[in-house]
Amino acid sequence: MIGLLFVFSVLLSFSVGYIFPFSTSNGPTVNDTLQHAIRSQRDVSKPIPIDRVEFSGVSLSSFFESEGYSSDSLSNLYGLLKENIAGVMIDLYWNEFTSKWQLCPAPFPNNITYTSSNRVVDVSWNNRTYKCDPNLSTDDIMSILNNFIRDTNTDVEANFMHVMYNLKSIHYKKSNQTINLENAYKEKNSNFNVGMDTLNDTVSLLSSYIFTPLLLEQYQSSSSKNANSSSSIRYIDSLNETQAIQKFYNQSTILMPSLQTTLLTQYKRLMVHVISNDMAESSRSYQISFSDKETIFFNNVFPAMIGHTNNASADDFCYELTHAYNGTDVNIMEFNRVSLNSTLRLIIDNDKTPFTTDSLSKYVRCGYCPVFNSTQYSSQKVTEGNSSIISQEFTSNLFWSWAPGQPSGPDNCTNCTRPVTNYTSKYSEASNGGSDEEEHSNNIAYKCVALTENGWEVSNCYEKYLFACQNKLSRNEWKLDNYTKRNYFDLDDDDCPEGYFFSLPRSNIEMLSLMTTVKQENVSYPIWIDLNDITVENCFVSGGPYAQCPYQETVTTDKFVRMIAPSFVVAMVVLVLIFLEKVFRKTPIQTNRKRYWKKAIQEYYAKNDYEGVPS
């Protein structure tokens, strides 16, 4: 029995330990370094508006074109979402014959036949033949997104996503000669129902998670009232960092809520955009409804700026921004113009000019959100232990923040001790006459983040580097003192000029403006930024060495049930065994011992029948 209880306690301890890892995801595994990079870049971006939060996307058309328009082509989507893909671009076709939205680029003849074992059929339109499943709809895509959102719906893992529609038409010119065409493609069988009636219907499965134009309007109205009721004059010194960020980005062309507000206060996980509308002009064309406008962002509300890798416009934009400086200063106005211009800035590749590691890094750093559209990315299945081509080739290039392989300490580090609780400030060091200098030189604590020419890297907090000071009211204006170096523990806002504070970039444009300042002032890397994981390993926070990790150990209900189930089963088995022991088990040794002594005493008294007290 004791052995069973010991086994139970071991299993229970293992299960409870498993309930609260820092990452609690299901599905294809993602290496720890990538998870930490994804989460930390998201956390850094929390105070900035959601339209400035960089993401990477994938075009589903590339999967459909290479594998056919069926649900099997979506098998990689969940795995890609786990690998830091947060955008899904979809070509959506308005079928003028049936007045439905569908994913297949060709109409289905009304006499089409298919079997449950082979649902994919060949359909032709405009001199092209497609393999399409009539049952395929946007619900197949949205159900995968819904599962991913549910599986990651914790403060630790939740990210903000984008669904992007390209609207197209299955169009024909109506005439006497097209009567037979209409008869062939008009929907006649009510049991054969292909597509959705409205745009709003295509995303109805995700309705509770969508940040809508209606919510944006409510936020803007509320923000306007708060601004009018508060004082119009605020001293710069009284602003904390969050207020300073809000004050700067409130000058944007479109006032948007922060990622923190949207993701962790309103609990919204995605936006839906129509990024292009190429529907043919026709009396049978789809008419955008009021309900659509309340749910989906169109270009007149939130515009999209789309670049293509085979077009020089995106490269020209990046070149101008990365060279926005001269011998005397950085062109802050140009960086601010880009930062405050509210657009969905996309760069899309293709088979002729796919992304390279260098081009992808360039586009991400200068403010573009890449969308992988080349068919080469769909050639490999994404399973547990088998990552996608995108992840294998471009993981390090999807981040505007971290350098390749980061966040991580140095390779083969055998003495990476972390004496971070007992450090000496610059003030106590001065009072000791600099006696702590030698002690600091022997300390190692790879817990602080420095900017290098390749991006952020985890560095030894006791090293003395230059440090980044950011203007409180102008997010792209930085000061770097080439004559002053500090270790991370000695840094505070007093080391920066008036109106500046020790800070870090929170967007790709802020990052680029800092790196441009480094070039303009001709200073050397590395440079300290306000980011560390001192209090909790791999929980990167800003606010100095005393900043606390904001996360409690949380887990979704579904995951908690799945993880506690083994312990519950073991506990029930042990309870049943205890019950069976109490009911059915007897101890023969104890029972015989009782009977034997009772009989022996009775026989003794029968032979020795004393009366009175023996002498």
Swiss-Prot record:
Example of a GO cellular component annotation carried by this entry: membrane
Keywords: Glycoprotein, Membrane, Signal, Transmembrane, Transmembrane helix
Cytoplasmic side: 581-615
InterPro entries documented for this protein: Telomere_Capping_Maintenance
Signal peptide boundaries: 1-17
Pfam families, per the entry: TIM-barrel_MTC6
Glycosylation sites: 31, 111, 127, 135, 176, 200, 228, 240, 250, 311, 326, 341, 373, 386, 412, 415, 422, 482, 522
TM helices/strands, residue ranges: 560-580
UniProt feature coiled coil, ranges: none
Function: May be involved in telomere capping.
Family note: Belongs to the MTC6 family.
Protein name: Maintenance of telomere capping protein 6
Record organism: Candida dubliniensis (strain CD36 / ATCC MYA-646 / CBS 7987 / NCPF 3949 / NRRL Y-17841)
Lineage: Eukaryota, Fungi, Dikarya, Ascomycota, Saccharomycotina
Gene expressing this chain: MTC6
